Structures are given as C-alpha cells and as structure tokens.
Amino acid sequence: RKCLNTPLPLFYKTCPEGKDLCYKMNFKLLPKKLSIKRGCTDTCPKSSLLVKVVCCDTDKCNK
C-alpha cells in the first residue's frame, strides 16, 4: 500500500507489511482541505469530538 504521509497531499510512502490502511485526520473546526496528519495504519483510529478520521484501502486514497 502507498499512502500520503504529509499534511499537504504531495508525498507518499510505501507502508510496512501489516499496515494496509491509509488514514487522514482533520480538525472538525478547520476547513476540510487542511489535514493535520496522514499515513499508514493497521486499524482505523477512532474519530473524536475535535478530530475526524477517514480510512481507506487503496493506494494514495487519503487525499
């Protein structure tokens, strides 16, 4: 899997074995285009009151 891994969707990395999901975290109070974190994960982190988490399972899907 290849996931974007910077706040701006410019760079990606190949995920280590076992981390087959890409994720993107956004502050709910900021514009949706401003991601605070992106990367690879094995399980999708849960959203909270302030942070929305979106996970996906295709290459570079966490734009």
From Swiss-Prot:
Pfam families: Toxin_cobra-type (PF21947). Disulfide bonds join C3-C22, C15-C40, C44-C55, C56-C61. It is found in: Secreted. Expressed by the venom gland. GO terms for cellular component: extracellular region. Coiled coil: none annotated. Is classified as a P-type cytotoxin, since a proline residue stands at position 31 (Pro-31 in standard classification). This is Cytotoxin homolog S3C2.
